[in-house]
Amino acid sequence: ALNHINKINSELITFSDDLDGLRKVPENIPNDKILHNNIGKPLTSIPDPFKKYASFGEHNNKMLIEFLKKFNFNFIFKSSTENYKKGIFNNSLERVLEKFDDIMSIILPTLGSERRKTYSPFLPICPETGKVLEIPVTEIDKKNKTLVFDNDGKKIKTDIFNGKCKLQWKVDWAMRWFTFDVDFEMYGKDLTESAILSNKICRALGK
């Protein structure tokens, strides 16, 4: 069996969640006021406090790549920001929208009663502030591929493509496996339940 597996072509993907919104400011960062002023924005939309790269996200990505290169193994680096904004995820995002009800039936039983009331697989990126919004989506239009969300009493409509929204992480995890045809991903023991859930979502998407 091991001899057979050794002959199967494979790729190793390193994926950066650099479209995630900044939740808190690390203590060991210089010029931390830059980060404090950009809480909630994607890491790649925040200026680099080290002032070396175009964004904080790019700085982190470069550090990760340089670290991995020291081990002399081949890997493919992928950026969440790039894949969302360049439309690489668009077909999969459309699939998530098509399977919205199935995904909700998988996720909702795992949430508390209050969280169930506001949960949506999609997180809009506010066109006014640039922040990743963890707020209720009030309308979903599967035909036109749009969402409506309520931002402090103001209803905003957005389509789901090209980085105008991102997915909640468990759905995002499954969507990546679906997009890149991933058969195995390493994860820690603390993520076992999340991985089981994401696997169910991936199957719902059609993998």
Enumerate the language-model features and the residues they cover.
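N-terminal Rossmann-like or analogous alpha/beta NTP/dinucleotide-binding catalytic cores
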Residues: 1-105, 198, 205
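Alpha-helical recognition segments enriched in aromatics with Gly/Pro capping
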Residues: 99-102, 109-207
